[in-house]
Swiss-Prot record:
It comes from Vanderwaltozyma polyspora (strain ATCC 22028 / DSM 70294 / BCRC 21397 / CBS 2163 / NBRC 10782 / NRRL Y-8283 / UCD 57-17). Component of the cytochrome c oxidase, the last enzyme in the mitochondrial electron transport chain which drives oxidative phosphorylation. The respiratory chain contains 3 multisubunit complexes succinate dehydrogenase (complex II, CII), ubiquinol-cytochrome c oxidoreductase (cytochrome b-c1 complex, complex III, CIII) and cytochrome c oxidase (complex IV, CIV), that cooperate to transfer electrons derived from NADH and succinate to molecular oxygen, creating an electrochemical gradient over the inner membrane that drives transmembrane transport and the ATP synthase. The keyword Membrane applies. The gene is COX3. It comes from the Eukaryota. The lineage of its organism: Eukaryota, Fungi, Dikarya, Ascomycota, Saccharomycotina. GO terms for biological process: mitochondrial electron transport, cytochrome c to oxygen. InterPro entries: Cyt_c/ubiquinol_Oxase_su3, Cyt_c_oxase_su3_dom, Cyt_c_oxidase-like_su3, Cyt_c_oxidase_su3-like_sf, Cyt_c_oxidase_su3_a-hlx. The chain crosses the membrane at residues 22-42, 46-66, 88-108, 128-148, 168-188, 205-225, 248-268. This is Cytochrome c oxidase subunit 3. PANTHER family: CYTOCHROME C OXIDASE SUBUNIT 3, CYTOCHROME C OXIDASE SUBUNIT III. Pfam families: COX3. Keywords: Membrane, Mitochondrion, Mitochondrion inner membrane, Translocase, Transmembrane, Transmembrane helix.
């Protein structure tokens, strides 16, 4: 608050002028190195995974340090005014829109192949030789888990707004564990699948769609864990919890995307 009061003597607008930071360029180059190492490894130019693992470690490390600075600016320096929070919300909604468009392209690809399978696929869908994952097994359990997580995170959010910190923490902890269980179940499904991403168009589009959602769920689990840590350490209040609100929106969007994945990829596609 002192920082905000001192700054108001010299700054006549509510926006946050970010100090020079190395993290945007570091994250950009680390993502570039991750993409290059993945491409080279998948095409056989690199026989080991050490470059991929190193690039992934740099991406995660630089991302953690970047978000550490953002949390410090929001919690300790008072840089996130109402105008800044509004800008963050708009930016996050645009990010959600971009994610919806990415998944729309994957659904389009799936329908393109599934609704008119040619002779190379055996003129049927799933293609000849592919044993699809049964929708009444792990996918159904994952659907129930995600719907339950949406209920528990809403309970936690309302408890936080009402100032009930204990119930908010409990709901958030349950939500975090539900998402972790979802990730574990999805991993078990992948390891027990009878086909891989290399098995034609079906394997490619199936693992592209569900795998992208899986990666987002891993990110969501990390975001929920960070929100839980911040809530325990009194970083969030009933009127100022932008990070938690955006995480909740992210969770609900992924819930809806999973419902479409379950209906199309698992149920209709079988």
């Amino acid at each position: 608050m002192l920082n905000y009061m001192e700054r108001s003597k010299h700054q006549q607008f509510p926006f946050h002028l970010v100090n020079p930071s190395p993290w945007p360029i570091v994250v950009s180059f680390s993502l570039l190195s991750l993409a290059l190492s993945l491409g080279l490894t998948m095409h056989g130019y690199i026989g080991e995974m050490y470059l991929v693992n190193l690039a992934l470690l740099v991406v995660l490390g630089s991302g953690v340090l970047w978000f550490r600075d953002i949390i410090a600016e929001a919690t300790y320096l008072g840089d996130h005014t109402a105008a800044v929070r509004k800008g963050i919300n708009i930016g996050f909604l645009l990010f959600v829109l971009s994610e919806v468009l990415i998944f729309s392209a994957l659904f389009w690809s799936y329908f393109h192949s599934a609704m008119s399978p040619d002779v190379t696929l055996g003129a049927c869908w799933p293609p000849v030789g592919i044993t699809a994952v049964q929708p009444t097994e792990l996918p159904l359990l994952n659907t129930i888990i995600l719907l339950a997580s949406g209920a528990t995170v809403t309970y936690s959010h309302h408890a936080l707004i009402q100032g009930n910190r204990k119930n908010s923490l409990s709901g958030l902890l349950i939500t975090t564990w539900l998402i972790i269980i979802f990730v574990i179940c999805q991993y078990i499904e992948y390891t027990n699948a009878t086909f891989t991403i290399s098995d034609g168009v079906y394997g490619s589009v199936f693992f592209a769609g569900t795998g992208l959602h899986f990666l987002h769920m891993v990110m969501l689990a990390i975001m929920l864990a960070v929100c839980y840590w911040r809530l325990r350490n009194y970083h969030l209040t009933n009127s100022h919890h932008v990070g938690y609100e955006t995480t909740i929106i992210y969770l609900h969007v992924l819930d809806v995307i999973w419902l479409f994945l379950y209906i199309v990829f698992y149920w209709w596609g079988v």
